[in-house]
Each structure stands twice: as C-alpha cells, then as structure tokens.
Amino acid sequence: MAELMLAESEREQIRNRCEVVLRQNWREGVRARDGFAFGYTCPSPSRYPWQWYWDSCFQAIAWRRYDPDRAERELRSLLGAQRDDGFIGHTIFWNQPLTGSRRYVYNVISPTDPTTASIQPPLLAWAWGIVIGEPSAEPGLVRHHEWLAEHRDLEGDGLIWIVSPDESGLDASSQFDGIWRHEAHGLPGYLRLVRRNRRLGFDLRPIARAGGPVCCEVVTNVLYNLSRLAMGQPSLTPALIARTYDEARGVFLPSSHPSPRGTPATTIAALAPLALPDLPAEIGRRLVEEHLLDPAQFWTPVPPPSVSAADPSFSVRDRGLFGQRRYWRGPAWINTAWLCWLGLVRLGYESEAAELAQRLGATVAGAGLREYYEPRTGAGMGALDFSWSSLVMDMLDPDLRGAAVSHLVS
C-alpha cells in the first residue's frame, strides 16, 4: 500500500487537472426555438460535442467541488431538455443537429430531432439530491419518474427495461452477447437494430410484442433505484435481487425477452448493486470478496475492468477486426469504479476503498483524464480530456466522505 500513496502535491496536480478539463469542456448557449439558456459539459471536445444524460449527472457531481453553480446548471439544463410528457433523451443536441452518418446510427426518429428517442440510466434525481437539494420538490423530476414507470416498467415490479444496449450506457458490453448478439457490436447489425427500433418509435411494449429483444439491465436499474430512493419512493432492491441475482454465481446478471442465449458474461454490471444503500450485507460481501477483490477477475492493477479478466469475452481492444465496438469489454472506467468504491466505503472496506482510489489516482496522474484505461498497464485509451473521469477526486477525498457517500451511508 505504501508505494501506492500519492503525495499531496500529486493530489493537487490531479485536482487542478480535473478542474481544467471540466472548464475547457464547458459549453453554453441559448436554445434557438425558445431562448432557454443552457450550459453543460461535453464529455470530450474531440469526440462527444453534445450533452449526454448520464455523463452530465456524473460531471455535475464532480463539478460541485469546483463550481457549485455550474454543477447545478448542468443538471437544470438536462432537465430543460425534457419533453412535456416527462421523457429525457440519452443525448441532447443543443442547436447542433445531427449531420453525416450520425443521422443513420443515432437513436432518433428524425435527424432533425432535438434529442435522441432513447434513454440512459436515469440517475438525474440522485445527482440532483447530491448537487442541488430535494429532488421530489422539482415537478420535472416527478414527471420524469412518472414517464419511466409508465413506459419502461414492462412487468409491473417497478424495474425498467431497455430496448438497445446503448440505453444502458454500456454499449457493446459482453453482457449483451446472448441478448442482441451481433446487433450490439457495430455495423451492420447495429444499424438494423436502430432501424427496427425507429420503426416502432423506440417504444418498449411494441418492441417487446414484436419479439424484442428487450432487457432488464442491472446498472440501469441500480441508478434508477438510487434516483427513486432520492425521490422518497419505495426501493427496487428486492425486485432487482429477485429478477437478476444469480445466487449460485454470486453476481447480478441481466434478464431479457427472449431469454439470453448461453452463459452470461461476468461484467462490471454484475457488481453495480454495491452502490445500493439497502443491498443486503451478505450479498455485498460476496460481490466484494468473491469477485471485486479477486486479482484474476476485477482487482487488476487498474481496477475494475469492465469485464472480468477471467471471462472469455474480456478484451482491451477499442475495436474489433470489422469495426465492432469493444470499449466496454475490458477497459476500466472511472464512473463504474466510483460506484464500486461507494460500495466498499458503505460496507466498511475502507482500506480497499483507499487502495482503489490510490491506484486510479496514480493512473490518472500518469495517463491523464482519459475515457477509459488499460486495466493491466494503466495506459490511457479512448477520448482525451474525458470529463467524468474527474470523479477520481471523489475517491481521493482524504476523509473518504464525498457528498454521494453521505447520501448512501447516513
């Protein structure tokens, strides 16, 4: 552990770099149709120019230590993109409509739409509670949760379902190999999936009636549940355990219609329930001790990889030989590491939480704020100056008491 400890000067350099990246990625303007003044952090200026739902939530949580006003504005801008019925899209284009090939591969009904017709993991109310205050007092968040319950709860147990791998935020994760198969990986299968969902309006029930696939995905529901808890709504943790917990393997796995083919991969989604404040301790300890802290699986030099290093699907390549998307099939990401870190703190694994923070801090010090990292070497991968990777500072908090932790353990 001693050799992992970052000097205070290194922490300060990381802190300063996080602030520089957040500030340089900040965008603001006025919506042309109604004069709404928006402000958001683009994930990375070179690759991701728009506002992404879950990115904005993570970025607002990171912003709160540097500029609370921008943290709040980020979330209010996301809510400002809401439709009248409560829907909030995966991507908001803010006066920059889709062009070129993106018109065909993005989840939109029409290329002139102001947002995608797809969702992302709905953690806005949770982030709102961390950054701004009581989310249940905001009518737009109430409408958002009403929309999710009405349109995405397929089976009446409160859990929500997705119609595309991208709606999970985990894109081509190997947890979807037995569900969407080649349609999750890239062209041409992914184009077929987009066209099929577009014909059905990205509407869950017609898609399910047509044979799907549709999926009850773990990360999506963990973050949705955290938002529900922040709203004062009943917990979905019992329903999530009943539907997705594989007691024999000691991990959480996606449920789908049709049922997945083959043995589901063990991915970072399997550990995401660690972030839930009411996850039974015995389940949490199994996730930590049998999986997260196992060097052969998730406790790699830069932990945790997005797929268990012991899983046959583990790969650290950005792309496959034919352009398949691979970046959620092995590389380590800061946002999912942060969710695991929250669980370690909540369950009392403070030395392991500190070690995770130190390893990731050292990685960021060496490679910068990248989209994701090679979990064995720490090499930076993907986009440069990636905004949500500034969450590393929440893990480097010397007292292990970020605002998100206090919401989980108090």
Features from the language model and the residues they span:
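Extended glycan-interaction surfaces of carbohydrate-active proteins
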Residues: 3-51, 75-114, 157-215, 239-331, ...
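Hydrophobic core segments within long, regular secondary-structure runs in both alpha-
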Residues: 11-19, 23, 68-79, 125, ...
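Conserved structured core elements
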Residues: 50-53, 68-72, 118, 122, ...
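Alpha-helical support elements that line or immediately flank enzyme active sites
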Residues: 56-85, 228, 269-280, 337-350, ...
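Hydrophobic/aromatic-rich effector regions of fungal transcription factors
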Residues: 105-133, 339-343
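Aromatic- and glycine-enriched pocket-lining scaffold segments that form the walls
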Residues: 139-152, 160-165, 204-205, 213-235
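Long, repeat-rich segments with strong aromatic
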Residues: 213-239, 278, 322-352
